Amino acid sequence: LDLLIEASIRAMEGTRHAQLAHWFSILPKVGLSEEQLGAGRLAAWASAAAATGTVVEVNEKWGCPGPVAVLALRDAGARIVASTDSHDAADVGRYDRVTAVLDAVEAAEREERR
């Protein structure tokens, strides 16, 4: 996981105008989850995204990054956009999974304010 985050940061630092698409979608494919990244890794990743002006997509098809990673991005001041990653015209502009991720982020923020 450290290598994944380090490689992600280096890629952002080495690319002008980067945009990360369905970042962390590899994790469940190899038996891991975003939760295993931990707050420190996510904070470093999110800070790098903010510092480099990297745009991070919340991806409809893969449902990632998830709420914890999106919270880290928001806390760092990174730019976040929605993406359908659609391969079918009928799916363009439909954001059921993205909405669920953002709703979870909003709920977590409400809890933090209490």
Question: Where in this protein do the model-derived segments appear?
Answer:
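Extended substrate/RNA-proximal surfaces in nucleic-acid metabolism proteins
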Residues: 1-51, 103-107
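Active-site metal-binding loops of divalent metal-dependent hydrolases
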Residues: 23, 60-61, 84-86
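Short active-site-adjacent structural elements
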Residues: 64-68, 72, 89-92
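Short acidic/histidine-rich active-site segments
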Residues: 79-93
